[in-house]
């Protein structure tokens, strides 16, 4: 009997059509997925049920009816008896859109619904032993107030106890969050905060009182420790725009600053200088001495305490020795426009020093006139060139240009009638003393930005050499024009600024230059052509710094193949080099304790005078000449 019943049931199951719910596709829009399962006739033996995800955010929680049987204890034996009750509960019509549901509850319910679908898909294929043939009945119920509003329902009778309990928990959680009314409470709290917040107003900065805002010292408050105000400081004198005004034009009286003008000693001094108006008749163009005899004479030159003189108050910028054979007279030009004269034969030695003030700025160049040794010509930065005449006791003005600053000059003619003057701005002036007035005959500009020294060739006096920033140029005075004069030759071997450039005193066959690159250079100027070759470069420290006068290497007028230059070496010394670069002699001693930047040698006698930056002169001479 049982076999026949089983066979009949098996045949009946083959003929009866089976139902299968459409599978959920992930690319469908969840918000518009219908809860009504589509009916599909499948000729298979088993039926599979898939749950489509749904959202409770569009429905009101008070109208959502969950099955009460989920709260009871479920088991596999109770599925059949409670099937009808679950159907009726889940087939109710759910009203549309639930309002005022928090976003947090929505996301929780959506995630839970999606999880149910995923877990059911995983569990149902594996439980083949417990699979049941479920008949899915789809019913439509209509609301009395609407004609077409229908809501699909699902049959949850085939769910496991775990799934039904899980749906119950989801529903209870949704009810709980809805009962809290979090969104409404948040809205009310937000309104309360906005109402309580006072209006924002810009804070006004308090005005500072006129009193002292910060702590200050008694020195700044100008009070003493007892609190008494200190007396007001005296008003400093107003500085004049030009601290060194130019001296008035015209001749200046020769007035000594350190000696009385009316005493007999000063008159005797002027008479002594005026008596030297005749130039020396001794031939200075005799042949050169041998180096051996020259060294012997240099070794006999000594310095003593009696031959150190304090002449001026400022640094010495220029120096000249009078060519007298009987008296030793030294002239110096100082920084503050002073011209000092020193007679070494006068005793005591303080009585032989006379200081005059013919200029207002540094005296950079000083020469005794070759035609009249009683005349001394001085040139200054203040743009004046004066001639001191001791026979008349005046400083006569030779050339004046208040718009320019002079740097150096030399005599173009042997009778000292014409002069060439170099300017700091690179211009050159040709001055004729025979022309009335204090102006120039010709003014020309050079290709140099600055001129420091000017020196005339001793034989071919139409040529003169200038030293400037980087180059040394040789010009022809006959070719100077009013616009810009081009040099005949340029010595371009120098790498830094040049302090001086001088022809050799007798023949002019050599040129010595002093450069800031710590080199002395000697050139062969025996043939003034397109190029003058470099003969010798002597390494010598010429870095004097800011407070010392720059070195200027000069030829010995008696021995034109030897150069005299100051030295920065210790102990202090004055050195003489041969044109080949060999050191010939070094002057020194216990009374030479400073750097002698400016040096001059007597044209015929073995007398050397060196000036330092404190206004002192140091004289080396033979004991016979003392």
From Swiss-Prot:
Interacts with CUL4A and/or CUL4B. Keywords: Repeat, WD repeat. The lineage of its organism: Eukaryota, Metazoa, Chordata, Craniata, Vertebrata. Residues 99-123 have a biased composition (Polar residues). It comes from Homo sapiens. Residues 140-150 have a biased composition (Acidic residues). This is WD repeat-containing protein 76. Belongs to the WD repeat DDB2/WDR76 family. GO terms for molecular function: DNA binding; enzyme binding. Specifically binds 5-hydroxymethylcytosine (5hmC), suggesting that it acts as a specific reader of 5hmC. One of its GO terms (cellular component) is nucleus. WD repeats lie at residues 311-352, 358-400, 402-441, 446-485, 493-533, 535-565, 590-626. InterPro entries: WD40/YVTN_repeat-like_dom_sf, WD40_repeat_dom_sf, WD40_rpt, WD_repeat_DNA-damage-binding. GO terms for biological process: DNA damage response; regulation of DNA damage checkpoint.
């Amino acid at each position: 009997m049982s076999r026949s019943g089983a066979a009949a049931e098996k045949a009946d199951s083959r003929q009866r059509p089976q139902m299968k719910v459409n599978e959920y596709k992930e690319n469908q829009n969840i918000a518009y997925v219908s809860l009504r399962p589509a009916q599909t006739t499948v000729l298979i033996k088993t039926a599979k049920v898939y749950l489509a995800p749904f959202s409770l955010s569009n429905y009101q929680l008070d109208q959502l009816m969950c099955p009460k049987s989920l709260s009871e204890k479920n088991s596999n034996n109770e599925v059949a008896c409670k099937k009808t009750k679950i159907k009726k509960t889940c087939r109710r019509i759910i009203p549309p859109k639930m309002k005022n549901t928090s976003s947090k509850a929505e996301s929780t319910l959506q995630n839970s619904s999606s999880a149910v679908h995923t877990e059911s898909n995983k569990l149902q294929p594996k439980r083949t032993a417990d699979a049941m043939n479920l008949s899915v009945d789809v019913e439509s119920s209509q609301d009395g107030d609407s004609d077409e509003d229908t809501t699909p329902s699902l049959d949850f009778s085939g769910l496991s106890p775990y799934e039904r309990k899980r749906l119950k928990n989801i529903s209870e959680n949704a009810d709980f969050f809805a009962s809290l009314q979090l969104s409404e409470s948040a809205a009310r709290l937000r309104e309360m905060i906005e109402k309580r917040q006072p209006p924002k107003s810009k804070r006004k900065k308090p005005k500072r009182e006129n009193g002292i805002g910060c702590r200050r010292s008694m020195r700044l408050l100008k009070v003493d420790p007892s609190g008494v105000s200190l007396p007001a400081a005296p008003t400093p004198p107003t500085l004049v725009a030009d601290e060194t005004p130019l001296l008035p034009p015209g001749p200046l009286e020769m007035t000594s600053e350190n000696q009385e003008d009316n005493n007999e000693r000063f008159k005797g001094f002027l008479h002594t200088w005026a008596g030297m108006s005749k130039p020396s008749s001794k031939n200075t163009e005799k042949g050169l001495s041998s180096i051996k005899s020259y060294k012997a004479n240099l070794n006999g030159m000594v310095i003593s305490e009696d031959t150190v003189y304090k002449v001026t108050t400022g640094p010495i910028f220029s120096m000249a020795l009078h060519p007298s054979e009987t008296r030793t007279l030294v002239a110096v030009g100082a920084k503050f426009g002073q011209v000092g004269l020193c007679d070494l034969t006068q005793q005591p030695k303080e009585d032989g020093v006379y200081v005059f003030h013919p200029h207002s700025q540094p005296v950079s160049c000083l020469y005794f006139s070759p035609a009249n040794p009683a005349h001394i010509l001085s040139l200054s930065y203040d743009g004046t060139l004066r001639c001191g005449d001791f026979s008349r006791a005046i400083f006569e003005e030779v050339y004046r240009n208040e718009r320019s600053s002079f740097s150096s000059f030399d005599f173009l003619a042997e009778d000292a009638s014409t002069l060439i003057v170099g300017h700091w701005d690179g211009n050159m002036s040709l001055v004729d003393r025979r022309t009335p007035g204090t102006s120039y005959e010709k003014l020309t500009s050079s290709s140099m930005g600055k001129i420091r020294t000017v020196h005339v060739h001793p034989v071919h006096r139409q040529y003169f050499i200038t030293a400037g920033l980087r180059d040394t140029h040789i010009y022809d005075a006959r070719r100077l024009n009013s616009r810009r004069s081009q040099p005949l030759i340029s010595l371009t071997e120098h790498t830094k600024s040049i302090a001086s450039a001088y022809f050799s005193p007798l023949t002019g066959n050599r040129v010595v230059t002093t450069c800031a690159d710590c080199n002395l250079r000697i050139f062969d100027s025996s043939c003034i052509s397109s190029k003058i070759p470099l003969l010798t470069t002597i390494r010598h420290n010429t870095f004097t710094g800011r407070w010392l006068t720059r070195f200027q290497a000069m030829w010995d007028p008696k021995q034109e193949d030897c150069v005299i230059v100051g030295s920065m070496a210790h102990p202090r010394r004055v050195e003489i080099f041969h044109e080949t670069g060999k050191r010939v002699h070094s002057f020194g001693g216990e009374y030479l304790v400073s750097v002698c930047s400016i040096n001059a040698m007597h044209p015929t006698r073995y007398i050397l005078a060196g000036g330092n930056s404190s206004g002192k002169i140091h004289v080396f001479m033979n004991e016979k000449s003392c």
